[in-house]
Amino acid sequence: MSGTVKDIVSKAELDNLRQSGAPVVLHFWASWCDASKQMDQVFSHLATDFPRAHFFRVEAEEHPEISEAYSVAAVPYFVFFKDGKTVDTLEGADPSSLANKVGKVAGSSTSAEPAAPASLGLAAGPTILETVKENAKASLQDRAQPVSTADALKSRLEKLTNSHPVMLFMKGIPEEPRCGFSRKVVDILKEVNVDFGSFDILSDNEVREGLKKFSNWPTFPQLYCNGELLGGADIAIAMHESGELKDAFKDLGITTVGSKESQDEAGKGGGVSSGNTGLSETLRARLEGLVNSKPVMLFMKGRPEEPKCGFSGKVVEILNQEKIEFGSFDILLDDEVRQGLKVYSNWSSYPQLYVKGELMGGSDIVLEMQKSGELKKVLTEKGITGEQSLEDRLKALINSSEVMLFMKGSPDEPKCGFSSKVVKALRGENVSFGSFDILTDEEVRQGIKNFSNWPTFPQLYYKGELIGGCDIIMELSESGDLKATLSE
Protein backbone atom coordinates (compact mmCIF):
# COMPACT_ATOMS: atom_id res chain seq x y z
CA MET A 1 0.00 0.00 0.00
CA SER A 2 1.24 3.48 -0.82
CA GLY A 3 0.48 5.18 2.48
CA THR A 4 -1.51 7.90 0.72
CA VAL A 5 -5.10 9.07 1.09
CA LYS A 6 -7.41 8.41 -1.85
CA ASP A 7 -10.90 9.68 -2.64
CA ILE A 8 -13.80 7.23 -2.88
CA VAL A 9 -15.91 7.81 -5.99
CA SER A 10 -18.69 5.24 -5.52
CA LYS A 11 -20.33 3.03 -2.93
CA ALA A 12 -19.46 -0.03 -5.04
CA GLU A 13 -15.76 0.84 -4.82
CA LEU A 14 -16.02 1.13 -1.04
CA ASP A 15 -17.92 -2.15 -0.74
CA ASN A 16 -15.22 -3.98 -2.71
CA LEU A 17 -12.46 -2.56 -0.51
CA ARG A 18 -14.33 -3.37 2.67
CA GLN A 19 -14.99 -6.95 1.57
CA SER A 20 -11.28 -7.48 0.91
CA GLY A 21 -10.84 -7.77 4.68
CA ALA A 22 -7.96 -5.29 4.87
CA PRO A 23 -8.05 -2.50 7.47
CA VAL A 24 -9.87 0.51 6.01
CA VAL A 25 -10.29 3.97 7.55
CA LEU A 26 -12.86 6.31 6.02
CA HIS A 27 -12.95 10.09 6.53
CA PHE A 28 -16.25 11.84 5.74
CA TRP A 29 -15.53 15.53 5.17
CA ALA A 30 -16.98 18.74 3.72
CA SER A 31 -15.18 21.57 1.93
CA TRP A 32 -16.86 24.25 4.08
CA CYS A 33 -15.86 22.64 7.38
CA ASP A 34 -12.63 23.95 8.94
CA ALA A 35 -12.46 20.99 11.32
CA SER A 36 -12.47 18.62 8.33
CA LYS A 37 -9.50 20.42 6.79
CA GLN A 38 -7.57 20.33 10.05
CA MET A 39 -8.28 16.66 10.67
CA ASP A 40 -7.28 15.88 7.08
CA GLN A 41 -3.70 16.85 8.00
CA VAL A 42 -3.76 14.30 10.81
CA PHE A 43 -5.36 11.74 8.50
CA SER A 44 -2.61 12.15 5.88
CA HIS A 45 0.16 11.63 8.44
CA LEU A 46 -1.58 8.55 9.81
CA ALA A 47 -1.76 7.13 6.28
CA THR A 48 2.04 7.40 6.09
CA ASP A 49 2.58 5.84 9.52
CA PHE A 50 0.19 2.91 8.97
CA PRO A 51 0.91 1.60 5.44
CA ARG A 52 -0.92 -1.69 6.17
CA ALA A 53 -4.26 0.13 6.11
CA HIS A 54 -6.28 1.80 3.36
CA PHE A 55 -7.10 5.48 4.02
CA PHE A 56 -9.98 6.97 2.04
CA ARG A 57 -11.92 10.22 2.01
CA VAL A 58 -15.58 10.75 1.12
CA GLU A 59 -17.04 14.22 0.53
CA ALA A 60 -20.22 13.69 2.53
CA GLU A 61 -22.54 15.99 0.59
CA GLU A 62 -21.36 14.76 -2.81
CA HIS A 63 -22.01 11.09 -1.99
CA PRO A 64 -25.27 10.98 0.01
CA GLU A 65 -25.72 7.25 -0.71
CA ILE A 66 -22.49 6.49 1.17
CA SER A 67 -23.15 9.02 3.94
CA GLU A 68 -26.63 7.62 4.52
CA ALA A 69 -25.35 4.04 4.57
CA TYR A 70 -23.10 4.90 7.52
CA SER A 71 -25.55 7.29 9.26
CA VAL A 72 -23.31 10.31 8.81
CA ALA A 73 -25.00 13.36 10.34
CA ALA A 74 -21.95 15.54 10.97
CA VAL A 75 -18.41 16.07 9.75
CA PRO A 76 -15.63 15.24 10.33
CA TYR A 77 -16.73 11.64 10.78
CA PHE A 78 -14.57 8.51 10.64
CA VAL A 79 -15.52 4.86 10.10
CA PHE A 80 -13.09 2.01 10.82
CA PHE A 81 -13.31 -1.37 9.06
CA LYS A 82 -11.51 -4.63 9.76
CA ASP A 83 -12.15 -8.09 8.32
CA GLY A 84 -14.98 -6.65 6.26
CA LYS A 85 -16.88 -5.29 9.28
CA THR A 86 -17.40 -1.87 10.83
CA VAL A 87 -15.54 -2.01 14.13
CA ASP A 88 -15.58 1.61 15.30
CA THR A 89 -16.60 5.19 14.47
CA LEU A 90 -15.49 8.66 15.55
CA GLU A 91 -17.34 11.97 15.21
CA GLY A 92 -15.69 15.35 15.57
CA ALA A 93 -12.20 16.87 15.63
CA ASP A 94 -10.29 14.71 18.12
CA PRO A 95 -6.76 13.93 16.81
CA SER A 96 -5.72 11.80 19.82
CA SER A 97 -8.77 9.55 19.56
CA LEU A 98 -8.31 9.24 15.80
CA ALA A 99 -4.67 8.15 16.22
CA ASN A 100 -5.59 5.61 18.89
CA LYS A 101 -8.48 4.13 16.91
CA VAL A 102 -6.35 3.86 13.75
CA GLY A 103 -3.65 2.12 15.79
CA LYS A 104 -6.13 -0.45 17.08
CA VAL A 105 -7.42 -1.22 13.59
CA ALA A 106 -4.21 -1.01 11.57
CA GLY A 107 -1.43 -1.58 14.10
CA SER A 108 0.16 -4.83 15.18
CA SER A 109 -2.43 -7.39 16.25
CA THR A 110 -0.17 -8.43 19.16
CA SER A 111 0.30 -4.95 20.54
CA ALA A 112 -1.39 -4.35 23.84
CA GLU A 113 -0.77 -0.61 23.72
CA PRO A 114 -2.91 1.90 21.82
CA ALA A 115 -1.24 4.09 19.22
CA ALA A 116 0.60 6.99 20.75
CA PRO A 117 -0.09 10.49 19.51
CA ALA A 118 3.55 10.63 18.39
CA SER A 119 2.69 8.10 15.70
CA LEU A 120 1.54 10.99 13.57
CA GLY A 121 4.69 10.84 11.48
CA LEU A 122 8.40 11.33 12.13
CA ALA A 123 9.65 13.95 14.57
CA ALA A 124 7.08 16.49 13.45
CA GLY A 125 4.21 14.26 14.55
CA PRO A 126 3.56 15.61 18.06
CA THR A 127 3.86 19.20 16.86
CA ILE A 128 1.35 18.66 14.09
CA LEU A 129 -1.00 16.90 16.47
CA GLU A 130 -0.94 19.70 19.02
CA THR A 131 -1.26 22.43 16.39
CA VAL A 132 -4.23 20.80 14.73
CA LYS A 133 -5.82 19.95 18.05
CA GLU A 134 -5.53 23.53 19.29
CA ASN A 135 -6.82 24.96 16.00
CA ALA A 136 -9.80 22.65 16.05
CA LYS A 137 -10.52 23.40 19.68
CA ALA A 138 -10.22 27.16 19.25
CA SER A 139 -12.35 27.45 16.16
CA LEU A 140 -14.97 24.79 16.70
CA GLN A 141 -14.66 23.68 20.33
CA ASP A 142 -14.02 20.17 19.01
CA ARG A 143 -17.61 19.94 17.83
CA ALA A 144 -18.61 18.35 14.57
CA GLN A 145 -20.39 20.55 12.05
CA PRO A 146 -23.70 19.33 10.62
CA VAL A 147 -23.76 18.03 7.07
CA SER A 148 -25.57 20.54 4.92
CA THR A 149 -28.76 19.35 3.29
CA ALA A 150 -31.79 21.49 2.55
CA ASP A 151 -33.74 20.01 5.47
CA ALA A 152 -30.78 20.08 7.86
CA LEU A 153 -29.99 23.71 7.03
CA LYS A 154 -33.62 24.76 7.45
CA SER A 155 -33.77 22.99 10.81
CA ARG A 156 -30.52 24.65 11.88
CA LEU A 157 -31.77 28.11 10.90
CA GLU A 158 -35.07 27.56 12.72
CA LYS A 159 -33.18 26.59 15.86
CA LEU A 160 -30.88 29.60 15.56
CA THR A 161 -33.67 32.13 15.00
CA ASN A 162 -35.56 30.68 17.98
CA SER A 163 -32.51 30.29 20.23
CA HIS A 164 -33.30 33.57 22.06
CA PRO A 165 -36.53 35.61 22.31
CA VAL A 166 -34.58 38.45 20.66
CA MET A 167 -31.94 37.24 18.21
CA LEU A 168 -29.63 39.39 16.08
CA PHE A 169 -27.76 38.05 13.05
CA MET A 170 -24.97 40.55 12.52
CA LYS A 171 -21.47 41.14 11.19
CA GLY A 172 -19.15 40.63 14.11
CA ILE A 173 -20.14 40.32 17.76
CA PRO A 174 -21.97 42.82 20.03
CA GLU A 175 -18.69 43.79 21.71
CA GLU A 176 -16.99 44.26 18.32
CA PRO A 177 -19.43 44.90 15.44
CA ARG A 178 -17.85 44.80 11.99
CA CYS A 179 -20.27 47.09 10.16
CA GLY A 180 -22.01 50.34 11.05
CA PHE A 181 -25.53 48.95 10.61
CA SER A 182 -24.85 46.05 12.96
CA ARG A 183 -23.34 48.45 15.50
CA LYS A 184 -26.44 50.68 15.31
CA VAL A 185 -28.85 47.83 16.03
CA VAL A 186 -26.68 46.60 18.91
CA ASP A 187 -26.73 50.13 20.37
CA ILE A 188 -30.53 50.27 20.04
CA LEU A 189 -31.04 46.93 21.78
CA LYS A 190 -28.75 48.01 24.59
CA GLU A 191 -30.58 51.32 24.83
CA VAL A 192 -33.98 49.65 25.26
CA ASN A 193 -32.30 47.37 27.80
CA VAL A 194 -33.37 44.04 26.32
CA ASP A 195 -31.44 40.77 26.52
CA PHE A 196 -30.56 39.39 23.09
CA GLY A 197 -28.59 36.61 21.48
CA SER A 198 -26.38 37.13 18.45
CA PHE A 199 -24.74 35.21 15.63
CA ASP A 200 -21.75 36.40 13.60
CA ILE A 201 -22.69 35.65 9.99
CA LEU A 202 -19.10 36.34 8.91
CA SER A 203 -18.06 33.17 10.74
CA ASP A 204 -20.40 30.83 8.84
CA ASN A 205 -21.12 31.36 5.15
CA GLU A 206 -23.71 28.57 5.10
CA VAL A 207 -25.82 30.43 7.66
CA ARG A 208 -25.14 33.76 5.96
CA GLU A 209 -26.40 32.63 2.55
CA GLY A 210 -29.09 30.31 3.91
CA LEU A 211 -30.67 32.98 6.09
CA LYS A 212 -31.14 35.29 3.10
CA LYS A 213 -33.44 32.72 1.49
CA PHE A 214 -34.95 31.52 4.77
CA SER A 215 -36.09 35.04 5.68
CA ASN A 216 -36.46 36.40 2.15
CA TRP A 217 -34.29 39.29 3.34
CA PRO A 218 -31.04 39.89 1.41
CA THR A 219 -29.01 42.01 3.83
CA PHE A 220 -27.65 42.06 7.37
CA PRO A 221 -28.17 42.68 10.20
CA GLN A 222 -31.45 40.78 10.66
CA LEU A 223 -33.39 41.10 13.92
CA TYR A 224 -35.75 38.32 15.04
CA CYS A 225 -38.32 38.28 17.86
CA ASN A 226 -39.74 34.93 18.96
CA GLY A 227 -38.44 33.36 15.76
CA GLU A 228 -40.07 35.92 13.42
CA LEU A 229 -38.12 38.42 11.34
CA LEU A 230 -38.65 41.98 12.55
CA GLY A 231 -36.45 43.52 9.87
CA GLY A 232 -33.08 45.06 9.24
CA ALA A 233 -31.32 48.16 10.52
CA ASP A 234 -33.67 50.70 8.88
CA ILE A 235 -36.78 49.13 10.40
CA ALA A 236 -35.20 48.69 13.82
CA ILE A 237 -34.05 52.33 13.79
CA ALA A 238 -37.48 53.63 12.69
CA MET A 239 -39.30 51.56 15.31
CA HIS A 240 -36.91 52.70 18.02
CA GLU A 241 -37.27 56.37 17.11
CA SER A 242 -41.07 56.12 17.21
CA GLY A 243 -41.04 54.19 20.50
CA GLU A 244 -42.66 51.24 18.77
CA LEU A 245 -39.78 48.81 19.25
CA LYS A 246 -40.17 48.74 23.01
CA ASP A 247 -43.95 48.39 22.61
CA ALA A 248 -43.46 45.48 20.21
CA PHE A 249 -41.21 43.69 22.71
CA LYS A 250 -43.81 44.28 25.41
CA ASP A 251 -46.67 42.88 23.33
CA LEU A 252 -44.60 39.80 22.51
CA GLY A 253 -43.98 39.10 26.19
CA ILE A 254 -40.33 40.18 26.05
CA THR A 255 -39.57 42.25 29.13
CA THR A 256 -36.61 44.56 29.40
CA VAL A 257 -33.82 43.87 31.86
CA GLY A 258 -34.86 45.00 35.32
CA SER A 259 -38.50 45.52 34.34
CA LYS A 260 -41.00 44.77 37.07
CA GLU A 261 -43.66 43.80 34.56
CA SER A 262 -44.31 40.10 34.29
CA GLN A 263 -44.62 38.37 30.97
CA ASP A 264 -48.34 37.96 31.60
CA GLU A 265 -48.75 41.70 31.99
CA ALA A 266 -46.56 42.37 28.99
CA GLY A 267 -48.49 39.95 26.83
CA LYS A 268 -51.94 41.34 27.58
CA GLY A 269 -53.87 41.96 24.42
CA GLY A 270 -56.13 44.76 23.46
CA GLY A 271 -59.63 45.21 22.26
CA VAL A 272 -61.32 48.34 21.01
CA SER A 273 -61.61 50.72 23.94
CA SER A 274 -65.10 52.09 24.52
CA GLY A 275 -63.81 55.45 25.63
CA ASN A 276 -60.86 55.74 23.23
CA THR A 277 -59.24 58.00 25.82
CA GLY A 278 -57.19 60.80 24.29
CA LEU A 279 -58.71 60.58 20.80
CA SER A 280 -60.58 63.45 19.22
CA GLU A 281 -64.08 62.69 17.97
CA THR A 282 -62.91 63.30 14.41
CA LEU A 283 -60.00 60.85 14.66
CA ARG A 284 -62.10 58.27 16.48
CA ALA A 285 -64.69 58.39 13.69
CA ARG A 286 -61.96 58.10 11.06
CA LEU A 287 -60.42 55.05 12.72
CA GLU A 288 -63.80 53.40 13.14
CA GLY A 289 -64.45 53.92 9.46
CA LEU A 290 -61.07 52.44 8.53
CA VAL A 291 -61.33 49.27 10.63
CA ASN A 292 -64.80 48.67 9.16
CA SER A 293 -63.89 49.59 5.58
CA LYS A 294 -63.48 45.91 4.64
CA PRO A 295 -64.80 42.74 6.32
CA VAL A 296 -61.15 41.75 6.88
CA MET A 297 -58.79 44.67 7.37
CA LEU A 298 -55.03 44.57 8.00
CA PHE A 299 -53.10 47.54 9.35
CA MET A 300 -49.50 46.83 8.44
CA LYS A 301 -46.11 48.24 7.55
CA GLY A 302 -45.93 48.46 3.79
CA ARG A 303 -48.29 46.90 1.28
CA PRO A 304 -49.31 43.23 0.83
CA GLU A 305 -47.14 43.12 -2.30
CA GLU A 306 -44.20 44.69 -0.44
CA PRO A 307 -44.33 44.29 3.36
CA LYS A 308 -41.84 46.46 5.25
CA CYS A 309 -41.47 44.17 8.27
CA GLY A 310 -41.39 40.43 8.85
CA PHE A 311 -44.44 40.38 11.13
CA SER A 312 -46.60 42.15 8.54
CA GLY A 313 -45.31 39.81 5.85
CA LYS A 314 -46.24 36.79 7.96
CA VAL A 315 -49.88 37.88 8.39
CA VAL A 316 -50.16 38.62 4.66
CA GLU A 317 -48.80 35.14 3.95
CA ILE A 318 -51.35 33.54 6.31
CA LEU A 319 -54.29 35.42 4.76
CA ASN A 320 -53.13 34.45 1.27
CA GLN A 321 -52.72 30.81 2.33
CA GLU A 322 -56.28 30.82 3.62
CA LYS A 323 -57.44 32.53 0.39
CA ILE A 324 -59.04 35.38 2.35
CA GLU A 325 -59.77 38.68 0.61
CA PHE A 326 -58.67 41.60 2.76
CA GLY A 327 -58.08 45.30 2.71
CA SER A 328 -54.93 46.91 4.03
CA PHE A 329 -53.61 50.22 5.30
CA ASP A 330 -49.93 51.19 5.37
CA ILE A 331 -49.44 52.82 8.78
CA LEU A 332 -46.00 54.09 7.73
CA LEU A 333 -47.72 56.63 5.47
CA ASP A 334 -50.00 58.16 8.10
CA ASP A 335 -48.63 58.81 11.58
CA GLU A 336 -52.00 60.05 12.86
CA VAL A 337 -53.55 56.67 12.12
CA ARG A 338 -50.43 54.84 13.31
CA GLN A 339 -50.49 56.45 16.76
CA GLY A 340 -54.26 56.80 17.05
CA LEU A 341 -54.99 53.14 16.34
CA LYS A 342 -52.77 52.09 19.24
CA VAL A 343 -55.12 53.99 21.58
CA TYR A 344 -58.30 53.00 19.73
CA SER A 345 -57.49 49.29 19.88
CA ASN A 346 -55.48 49.32 23.11
CA TRP A 347 -52.82 47.42 21.13
CA SER A 348 -49.42 49.05 20.86
CA SER A 349 -47.73 47.33 17.92
CA TYR A 350 -48.28 46.34 14.30
CA PRO A 351 -49.60 44.58 12.32
CA GLN A 352 -53.20 44.59 13.59
CA LEU A 353 -55.85 42.39 11.99
CA TYR A 354 -59.56 43.26 12.22
CA VAL A 355 -62.55 41.14 11.23
CA LYS A 356 -65.81 43.09 10.86
CA GLY A 357 -64.37 45.88 12.98
CA GLU A 358 -63.18 43.60 15.78
CA LEU A 359 -59.48 43.30 16.60
CA MET A 360 -58.16 39.74 16.23
CA GLY A 361 -54.61 40.57 17.29
CA GLY A 362 -51.07 40.78 15.95
CA SER A 363 -48.92 38.32 14.03
CA ASP A 364 -48.33 35.89 16.89
CA ILE A 365 -52.06 35.57 17.66
CA VAL A 366 -53.02 35.23 13.98
CA LEU A 367 -50.37 32.53 13.53
CA GLU A 368 -51.67 30.57 16.53
CA MET A 369 -55.26 30.94 15.29
CA GLN A 370 -54.25 29.54 11.91
CA LYS A 371 -52.40 26.59 13.42
CA SER A 372 -55.33 25.68 15.67
CA GLY A 373 -57.97 26.16 12.97
CA GLU A 374 -59.54 28.97 15.01
CA LEU A 375 -58.97 31.56 12.27
CA LYS A 376 -61.02 29.65 9.72
CA LYS A 377 -63.70 29.03 12.36
CA VAL A 378 -63.98 32.74 13.25
CA LEU A 379 -64.16 33.75 9.60
CA THR A 380 -66.88 31.17 8.96
CA GLU A 381 -68.87 32.27 12.01
CA LYS A 382 -68.70 35.89 10.88
CA GLY A 383 -69.82 34.98 7.37
CA ILE A 384 -66.50 35.85 5.73
CA THR A 385 -66.01 32.35 4.34
CA GLY A 386 -68.54 29.60 3.78
CA GLU A 387 -68.48 26.20 5.47
CA GLN A 388 -65.79 24.15 3.73
CA SER A 389 -66.90 20.83 2.29
CA LEU A 390 -64.82 17.70 2.92
CA GLU A 391 -63.96 17.53 -0.78
CA ASP A 392 -62.71 21.13 -0.77
CA ARG A 393 -60.73 20.44 2.38
CA LEU A 394 -59.10 17.36 0.84
CA LYS A 395 -58.25 19.28 -2.34
CA ALA A 396 -56.68 22.05 -0.27
CA LEU A 397 -54.62 19.55 1.74
CA ILE A 398 -53.46 17.63 -1.34
CA ASN A 399 -52.36 20.86 -3.01
CA SER A 400 -50.81 22.42 0.10
CA SER A 401 -47.37 21.22 -1.07
CA GLU A 402 -46.14 20.31 -4.54
CA VAL A 403 -45.16 16.90 -3.14
CA MET A 404 -47.60 15.84 -0.40
CA LEU A 405 -47.47 12.65 1.67
CA PHE A 406 -50.44 11.34 3.65
CA MET A 407 -48.91 9.00 6.18
CA LYS A 408 -49.17 7.47 9.63
CA GLY A 409 -47.19 9.67 11.99
CA SER A 410 -44.78 12.42 11.00
CA PRO A 411 -41.64 12.28 8.80
CA ASP A 412 -39.47 12.44 11.91
CA GLU A 413 -41.55 9.83 13.73
CA PRO A 414 -43.36 7.50 11.30
CA LYS A 415 -45.88 5.15 12.92
CA CYS A 416 -45.79 2.36 10.36
CA GLY A 417 -43.04 0.67 8.36
CA PHE A 418 -44.53 1.57 4.98
CA SER A 419 -44.70 5.27 5.84
CA SER A 420 -41.11 5.09 7.11
CA LYS A 421 -39.93 3.53 3.83
CA VAL A 422 -41.52 6.27 1.71
CA VAL A 423 -40.07 9.04 3.91
CA LYS A 424 -36.61 7.47 3.60
CA ALA A 425 -36.96 7.18 -0.19
CA LEU A 426 -37.99 10.84 -0.54
CA ARG A 427 -35.21 12.06 1.71
CA GLY A 428 -32.73 9.85 -0.13
CA GLU A 429 -33.57 11.79 -3.29
CA ASN A 430 -33.48 15.15 -1.43
CA VAL A 431 -37.13 15.75 -2.32
CA SER A 432 -38.87 18.44 -0.25
CA PHE A 433 -42.38 17.39 0.74
CA GLY A 434 -45.30 18.26 2.97
CA SER A 435 -47.05 15.68 5.10
CA PHE A 436 -50.31 15.01 6.94
CA ASP A 437 -50.72 12.52 9.77
CA ILE A 438 -53.94 10.65 8.96
CA LEU A 439 -54.00 9.20 12.48
CA THR A 440 -54.91 12.66 13.81
CA ASP A 441 -58.04 13.16 11.67
CA GLU A 442 -60.44 10.31 10.99
CA GLU A 443 -62.53 12.42 8.60
CA VAL A 444 -59.51 13.01 6.36
CA ARG A 445 -58.36 9.40 6.75
CA GLN A 446 -61.63 7.93 5.50
CA GLY A 447 -62.43 10.74 3.08
CA ILE A 448 -59.19 10.55 1.15
CA LYS A 449 -59.64 6.82 0.56
CA ASN A 450 -62.81 7.57 -1.42
CA PHE A 451 -61.42 10.74 -2.96
CA SER A 452 -58.35 8.96 -4.36
CA ASN A 453 -59.96 5.54 -4.80
CA TRP A 454 -56.94 4.18 -2.93
CA PRO A 455 -57.71 2.20 0.23
CA THR A 456 -54.37 2.19 2.06
CA PHE A 457 -51.69 4.49 3.40
CA PRO A 458 -49.24 6.08 2.80
CA GLN A 459 -50.41 7.99 -0.29
CA LEU A 460 -48.06 10.29 -2.21
CA TYR A 461 -49.32 13.16 -4.39
CA TYR A 462 -47.49 15.35 -6.85
CA LYS A 463 -49.11 18.60 -8.04
CA GLY A 464 -52.45 17.34 -6.76
CA GLU A 465 -52.26 13.98 -8.56
CA LEU A 466 -51.92 10.62 -6.80
CA ILE A 467 -48.61 8.89 -7.54
CA GLY A 468 -49.35 5.82 -5.43
CA GLY A 469 -48.57 4.00 -2.22
CA CYS A 470 -45.47 2.39 -0.75
CA ASP A 471 -44.98 -0.32 -3.40
CA ILE A 472 -45.12 2.12 -6.30
CA ILE A 473 -42.83 4.62 -4.60
CA MET A 474 -40.27 1.91 -3.82
CA GLU A 475 -40.36 0.68 -7.44
CA LEU A 476 -39.77 4.23 -8.68
CA SER A 477 -36.95 4.65 -6.17
CA GLU A 478 -35.23 1.39 -7.09
CA SER A 479 -35.48 2.14 -10.83
CA GLY A 480 -34.05 5.63 -10.32
CA ASP A 481 -37.23 7.29 -11.61
CA LEU A 482 -38.59 8.77 -8.36
CA LYS A 483 -36.97 12.20 -8.53
CA ALA A 484 -37.79 12.57 -12.23
CA THR A 485 -41.43 11.65 -11.57
CA LEU A 486 -41.64 14.32 -8.87
CA SER A 487 -40.07 17.07 -10.95
CA GLU A 488 -41.85 16.80 -14.29
From Swiss-Prot:
InterPro entries: Glutaredoxin, GRX_PICOT-like, Monothiol_GRX-rel, Thioredoxin-like_sf, Thioredoxin_domain
An annotated GO cellular component: cytosol
Short name of any one Pfam family annotated for the protein: Thioredoxin
Domain Thioredoxin stretches: 2-107
Annotated [2Fe-2S] cluster binding sites: 416
The keyword Ubl conjugation is annotated on this UniProt entry: yes
Domain Glutaredoxin: 154-256, 284-386, 391-488
Residues noted as binding glutathione in the record, renumbered to the chain: 408, 445, 457, 470-471
Post-translational modification note: Ubiquitinated at Lys-154. Polyubiquitinated by RGLG3 and RGLG4. Polyubiquitination of GRXS17 leads to its degradation by the proteasome.
Gene Ontology MF, one: 2 iron, 2 sulfur cluster binding
Cellular compartments annotated: Cytoplasm
Keywords, ordered alphabetically: 2Fe-2S, Cytoplasm, Iron, Iron-sulfur, Metal-binding, Redox-active center, Repeat, Ubl conjugation
Record field: transmembrane: none
GO biological process: auxin polar transport; DNA damage response; reactive oxygen species metabolic process; regulation of cell cycle; response to heat
Gene3D superfamilies to which the protein is assigned, alphabetical: Glutaredoxin
Keyword Iron-sulfur: yes
Role played: May only reduce GSH-thiol disulfides, but not protein disulfides. Participates probably to the maturation of iron-sulfur proteins and to the regulation of the redox state of the BOLA proteins. The GRXS17-BOLA2 heterodimer binds a labile, oxygen sensitive iron-sulfur cluster.
The record's note on its domains: The Glutaredoxin 2 domain is sufficient for interaction with all BOLA.
Protein family: Belongs to the glutaredoxin family. CGFS subfamily.
Self-association and partners: [2Fe-2S]-bridged holo-homodimer. Interacts in vitro with SUFE1, BOLA1, BOLA2 and BOLA4. Interacts in vivo only with BOLA2. Interacts with RGLG3 and RGLG4.
Entry protein name: Monothiol glutaredoxin-S17
